[in-house]
Amino acid sequence: MRSAEGELDGQVLAERRLIRSLFEYRDAMLKAMIIGLALVLAWWTWASWGDIQIDCGRELYVPMEILRGRLLYRDIWYPYGPLMPYIEAALLATFGPHLLVFYAFGLITTIGCALLLYRIGAMLQQPVVGFTAALGLLLQGFAPNFMNFIFPYSYAASFALFLALLCALLVLRHIVHGGSSALVIAGVAAGLTLLCKPEIGEACYAILAGATLLDALAQRSALVLIRKAVTWLPGLIIAAAIYAWFVLNLSPALVLENWIGPPGPYFFRRQGRYLYGNAGFRFDPIEVGILVAAAMLSVGLWYGIARALRSRSGRMWLAAGVGLQISLARVIPPFTGRLPFGAQLLGLLQSMLFYPKSMFFIGLMAWLAAIYRLVESPRDRLALALAAYHLFAISCALRVFTQIVPFGYAIFYAPPLFLSFLLCLAEVVDHADVAVNANRPNAVNVIMTAEVLMLLFILFPGPSERTAKFTTSWGSIYVTPEEARVGRQITEFILNQKQERQRVVVLPEGPMFYAITETEAPDRWYTFLPGFRSPDQQRDYVSDLRRANPKYVVLTDRSFQEYGTPRFGVDFDQIVYRWILSHYHVINEFGQFEAGGGSGGLAALVYERND
């Protein structure tokens, strides 16, 4: 008898080992697919990321200035937290000044973000949900412009997202599996996120505080609240100490003067509302009402689709619908344009179902549903984890909550929310399966497959117009032929004047040219963005120009439409521009210069000092 029982126990153990190995194999395979897709996207879009004029040059110039002994904020203007420039400086000191260093760092960060999203999705639902979220992030992260993850407008944004996802994963692991060490590391990750992008750091503290408070309420224990808060507070103390060092050694006004974010500085009063509103941080009651209605409609449509999946004909209709959208989006786009409102209808379907613009409010509904579930079952750890994660996702996306789109500024804030949407979608399918007795895992797999196909065909980067290689001392970047030609002209001009020991200033924005020619701006303002300098600060800059006495000024036709004031010298910083016109004269033109960016690319006028 014992022999039979032992044989049965051995068989059960063998089956468990087999099941575990199958799960581990699936997990390893999905991770390998994520890494493989990232490498394919990197190969397909190689070196076509970033911009040689807008923002990206700051990521090269600022760490080089730090290595020259300059102090952030005091000697170099920088609009975000202090951590990323010093990491970049350490990378340059270790590996040397080369774009490959930044490309590699960006690629590693991107893969890290995707794997973290995958792990969170697999923990809260099932691996296919996490895989779909990871794929969405990857397809957004390799865009051939400066809104990408490989060579972005700011590595502070992409690295902050990585740290925030790490924090979220550790908090969720603590909720589900227990252990205080995960919470300690999560607190440190949250503090580091605050030192990169404070608004993303706030989302970290939303999940930390939310999870702590909800757990304490569920257990009805003030001791739990105090003990867990003390566990993750060291990270906040580290961040506060570093910020305090800058504030005490400089001044609060000087530090705030650098930042784009907080209310108070001159920039916020002049440009903040337009810039933030344009990015999606706006409160229009009518727009919010439309988005709430769209969120409910989107969830309702997916519920109907999930119910239809109980039959083979329903699955065939879903496949046909996805195939039609793919055809209209990629295979026969000219046909779409000839249809009455064809492109608009296609965009509406995509933004209602596969990447809803109303995703913030879907996430909000998912959070409220998780709170309700937690109230009904206070000891349900999965409900607590879902409530904590949805709070994190909507907090992270608050900066762009009315403009949730799979491109542009939103890609640094919306990936956690996209996973929140997928989790909600899986819950909707679950509820529909219960209602119609369908096979839930199969239904989730079918819908996630449809989501993956649509993401691939909508977001996979097409052929780029960036066909010309712009080669510098830092390596190469692909840009448009005109940008490459003008970029070479500007670079060669600065290098020639450097040999003659003549100083060249690039305005209003072009820090990459300072970096690749190993020259410096005349003072801490290496970039002129609308609204950052008050009239008094403009006069101070003019005084610095007089002291530096540059022989030449290269004035590009950079347009600042995103700020609502596109033209340097006309819409902003008129004092500086008038001084240049009165002390310099035009001697050359690179490209076809049109004030305010009319050239559509890169063009510049060369001014020489009136001696």
Predicted features and spans:
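Short hydrophobic alpha-helices at membrane interfaces in multi-pass membrane enzymes
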Residues: 170-192, 221-234, 313-322, 380-392
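Short periplasmic/luminal acceptor-recognition loop of GT-C membrane glycosyltransferases, typified by
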Residues: 79, 463-532, 541-546, 550-562, ...
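Extracytoplasmic catalytic/substrate-binding loops of multi-pass membrane glycan-assembly enzymes
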Residues: 47-62, 73-90, 97-100, 250, ...
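Aromatic- and kink-enriched transmembrane "portal" helix at the membrane-lumen/periplasm boundary
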Residues: 99, 113, 135-161, 170, ...
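Membrane-interface alpha helices of multi-pass inner-membrane proteins
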Residues: 182-198, 204-212, 243, 323-327, ...
